[in-house]
Amino acid sequence: MENLNKDFTLVGSKGSDSTEKIAKPALSFFQDAWRRFKKNKIALVAMWIIAITLVFSVISAFVVPQSKANYFNPNKSQVYGNLPPKLSGDLPFWNGDFKAPGSAEKTDVYKAQGVPEKDKYVFGTDKYGRSLAKRTVVGLRISLIIALAAALIDLVIGVTYGIISGWMGGKVDMVMQRIIEIIQSVPNLVVVTMLALLLGQGISSIIIAIGLFAWTGMARQVRNMVLSYKERDFVLASKTLGQSTWKIAVKHLLPNVSGVIVVQIMFDIPSMIMYEAVLSAINLGVKPPTSSLGTLINDGIASLQFYPFQLIIPAIVLSVLSLTFIFFGDGLRDAFDPRASED
């Protein structure tokens, strides 16, 4: 009997502690969001394009300053003006050949205008002989500065307004939301155009005009999130402990609505880039000779019939830039709020 007791073991008792251990550590909110974001390949590619574009824009400020992109020699405009893109004579689009309107054959414009063989322009030149590649680089940088600066105004006003409206509630919230409805009842483009007319041309004028009326969407998104979070246990506990409203907003509410803020900013930036392009199209953009993507497109429209490449190239850059922000924002939205993508 003693031998039986010695040999007796409880089934399943061995290794019970090891089976109850968690195999992996719990992921934080942002770690889980990054895990979901990596599955969206289009958004991941868009993120890298945006990162490369931002780094390129910063570096280009030292390599291609505005003065270099704006400079031209009036005495050589006939030689270097309106040259088509050229890299090599073997490439179909970048060979320097161009078929003039009404002509049946293509001609080597570089030879016809007496351009030295060593001079090649990857995006061609404008009517003054300025390199479109340099002007596109500067235009990309200016458009990004305008969009990001306007987005910063959108961020500050929209988040502050939304937190105050959602936190206060009641009549204060009702009045603040009616103000937003009044602003949104007028198309943003009309308001931005009128404000740009009052402020005049210039980068700062465009930033103010766009930023002052682009925050309403951000404010509503933040307000809705604050309304849902302010009755949560961790907020009520902070109130009970006597924490100030400002501390609760910064320490508890703002981190929880940060996902919505980032997503909204990513969707606002393409709109701001388009606003700048529209303002430039009606001569309310940056002051000449400074270039932006909008001014380049506006100049290209004037010469579309004869030199379509002057419009096509900046239009492609503008479209790709806007789409990358849209795809990136879409990926962030699905990562931060997977339930929204399932719906």
From Swiss-Prot:
GO terms for biological process: peptide transport; protein transport; transmembrane transport. The complex is composed of two ATP-binding proteins (DppD and DppF), two transmembrane proteins (DppB and DppC) and a solute-binding protein (DppA). Residues 140-329 form the ABC transmembrane type-1 domain. It comes from the Bacteria. Its main location: membrane. One of its GO terms (cellular component) is plasma membrane. It is found in: Cell membrane. This is Dipeptide transport system permease protein DppC. Keywords: Cell membrane, Membrane, Peptide transport, Protein transport, Transmembrane, Transmembrane helix, Transport. It is a multi-pass membrane protein. The chain crosses the membrane at residues 44-64, 144-164, 195-215, 259-279, 309-329. Belongs to the binding-protein-dependent transport system permease family. OppBC subfamily. Part of the ABC transporter DppABCDF involved in dipeptide transport. Responsible for the translocation of the substrate across the membrane.
